[in-house]
Amino acid sequence: MSLLFDFFSLDFIYYPVSWIMWVWYRLFAFVLGPSNFFAWALSVMFLVFTLRALLYKPFVRQIRTTRQMQELQPQIKALQKKYGKDRQRMALEMQKLQREHGFNPILGCLPMLAQIPVFLGLYHVLRSFNRTTGGFGQPHLSVIENRLTGNYVFSPVDVGHFLDANLFGAPIGAYMTQRSGLDAFVDFSRPALIAVGVPVMILAGIATYFNSRASIARQSAEAAANPQTAMMNKLALYVFPLGVVVGGPFLPLAIILYWFSNNIWTFGQQHYVFGMIEKEEEAKKQEAVRRRAANAPAPGAKPKRSPKTAPATNAAAPTEAGDTDDGAESDASTERPADTSNPARRNSGPSARTPRPGVRPKKRKR
């Protein structure tokens, strides 16, 4: 095990990558054997699965961000149409729209950006198992020196087991067009390497194609109509899978296995996450319908109206006035028999001057 850590290099990437791969290798080597081809192949594949499991939550955010971006496409097109000539104003309005909806485009790129250093780290670690070729950033060692030198977390014994691991003469660390460093492998057969590598390479290209196709099929019509999105869809469907097939002969067999397993994981995880999000959205719609149904009145029932109550002061005033008027009228009625004999007093009494409730007072003639 190499314990020399260089703080001014990318060792902070190389050591974690080699450690995760070493843990899985020790587990599968215990079952299959230390020099078994599939023990090393599974260690590379489970390195991918470990990374993708750690990036599960950012991947879910990426999917949600992508769907949110598709939902905002009509508003984005409206802003582009309105402020197409004013780039600065359009950028400000776009930022405002993103803030209003809590949209962060960086979250959509996080899983992809996180995989780049891991891919570079794995490529460097696999390349460091065979230092007999030299090259950029690598010492030029002899075959014996190479087997006596550790590779980050891997011990010199592990390095020897990696160089000995092959499938029908196809070493896992070799590539089809390799010309130098062949002496480091115990058994190397180029026809066997091509026979093993080409099917894996084609499977990796097919997995890339179906992964891109599944992702494009879930795009909205507005997003697919965007010229930039349409161009990226064509690249993802045809150029990227073809790039895997064309570039495969120049990459170690372990890297092709890495690419194949990464696309298989992405395909399954994408299907699961999209299904989960669709179920959540369907549950929200059903909950909204249930709430509207609970708040709606029963069929044929009249809506209940709260009774209107008059102010107490307005209700009390007529009552009091009525009481006083009734009292005055009763007093006048008791006095009327005594005044019947004198018409002058009957006309000049208080009962003649006070009008009854609701009767307009008579105007006096001047």
UniProtKB/Swiss-Prot annotation:
Compositional bias ranges of the Polar residues kind: 339-351
Membrane topology: Multi-pass membrane protein
Main location: membrane
GO terms under biological process: protein insertion into membrane; protein transport
Disordered: annotated segments: 285-366
UniProt keyword annotations, A-Z: Cell membrane, Chaperone, Membrane, Protein transport, Transmembrane, Transmembrane helix, Transport
InterPro entries: YidC/ALB3/OXA1/COX18 (IPR001708), YidC/Oxa/ALB_C (IPR028055), YidC_ALB_C (IPR047196)
One CC-aspect GO term: plasma membrane
Annotated GO MF terms: membrane insertase activity
Membrane-crossing residue ranges in chain numbering: 3-23, 28-48, 106-126, 191-211, 237-257
Biased composition (Low complexity): 308-321
Annotated localization: Cell membrane
Role summary: Required for the insertion and/or proper folding and/or complex formation of integral membrane proteins into the membrane. Involved in integration of membrane proteins that insert both dependently and independently of the Sec translocase complex, as well as at least some lipoproteins. Aids folding of multispanning membrane proteins.
Family affiliation: Belongs to the OXA1/ALB3/YidC family. Type 1 subfamily.
NCBIfam families according to UniProt: PRK03449.1, yidC_oxa1_cterm
Oligomer and partners: Interacts with the Sec translocase complex via SecD. Specifically interacts with transmembrane segments of nascent integral membrane proteins during membrane integration.
Matches recorded under PANTHER family: CYTOCHROME C OXIDASE ASSEMBLY PROTEIN COX18, MITOCHONDRIAL, OXA1
Protein name according to UniProt: Membrane protein insertase YidC
Encoding gene, per UniProt annotation: yidC
